[in-house]
């Protein structure tokens, strides 16, 4: 059987040349990273306080 391979170029557009776009993207990425870290910390706190109930609820919802 013949297989086709396609290559996609990386987003190359006019936005690559704008330094402001890169700085804004970096700022957004840092904010999202901070929000994700905060959410993971909150999950860790819940698990530390009540891991048994968390696991029980997870299994009841179909988790393994």
Swiss-Prot record:
Region (ARC ATPase binding): 21-58
Region annotated Disordered, chain positions: 1-42
Entry comment on modification after translation: Is modified by deamidation of its C-terminal glutamine to glutamate probably by the deamidase Dop, a prerequisite to the subsequent pupylation process.
Any one GO molecular-function label of the UniProt entry: proteasome binding
Residues with PTM Deamidated glutamine: 64
Biological pathway: Protein degradation; proteasomal Pup-dependent pathway
Residues in cross-link Isoglutamyl lysine isopeptide (Gln-Lys) (interchain with K-? in acceptor proteins): 64
Coiled coil: 23-52
Keyword set, alphabetical order: Coiled coil, Isopeptide bond, Ubl conjugation pathway
A Gene Ontology BP annotation from the UniProt entry: modification-dependent protein catabolic process
Transmembrane stretches, start-end: none
Assembly notes: Strongly interacts with the proteasome-associated ATPase ARC through a hydrophobic interface; the interacting region of Pup lies in its C-terminal half. There is one Pup binding site per ARC hexamer ring.
Family under the similarity heading: Belongs to the prokaryotic ubiquitin-like protein family.
Domain notes: The N-terminal unstructured half of Pup provides a signal required to initiate unfolding and degradation by the proteasome but is not needed for pupylation, while the C-terminal helical half of Pup interacts with ARC to target proteins to the proteasome.
Function of the molecule: Protein modifier that is covalently attached to lysine residues of substrate proteins, thereby targeting them for proteasomal degradation. The tagging system is termed pupylation. Among the identified substrates are the SodA and Ino1 proteins.
UniProt-recorded name of the protein: Prokaryotic ubiquitin-like protein Pup
Organism from which the protein derives: Mycolicibacterium smegmatis (strain ATCC 700084 / mc(2)155)
């Amino acid at each position: 059987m013949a297989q086709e391979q396609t290559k996609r170029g990386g987003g190359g557009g006019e936005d690559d040349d704008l330094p402001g776009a890169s700085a804004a993207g970096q700022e957004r990425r840092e904010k999202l990273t901070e929000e994700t870290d905060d959410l993971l910390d909150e999950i860790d706190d819940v698990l530390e306080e009540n891991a048994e109930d968390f696991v029980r609820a997870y299994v009841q919802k179909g988790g393994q």
